[in-house]
Amino acid sequence: MAPAVASGAMATDPRVDAYLSKLPDDQQRLLDGVRRRVAELAPDAVETISYGMPAYKVDGRFFLSYAAWKKHCSIYPIDDGLLDRHADAVRGYGRTKGALHFTPQQPLPDALLKDLVRQRVTEARARSGY
């Protein structure tokens, strides 16, 4: 399914709308906030579904994905070392390899999300050769 593109906006994918619509209200609001912030920070990104979860790419390279789980949401910056480099900022959040867990009661700080998105976009572009 081709992503929809509004003038001056990030290309969006209706499958992400469907993914979010199936979530409980609190997770839906939380992940919609992540989605909106990614769109603001990376307006030329393409939104898609990869491995059953919303994902974003620039210049053909994935840079971020997220998912809802039973007890938390996760953001996957697709760079295991990036979360280690933000050790102070992610202290107190649950983590698994390559994922940062957050909840409606403990959302991601905007500054952290901004840093993760910007760094991953920069890294993805550097690897794509553009």
Specify the residue positions occupied by each region the protein language model found:
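Charge-dense, helix-prone N-terminal extensions
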Residues: 1-130
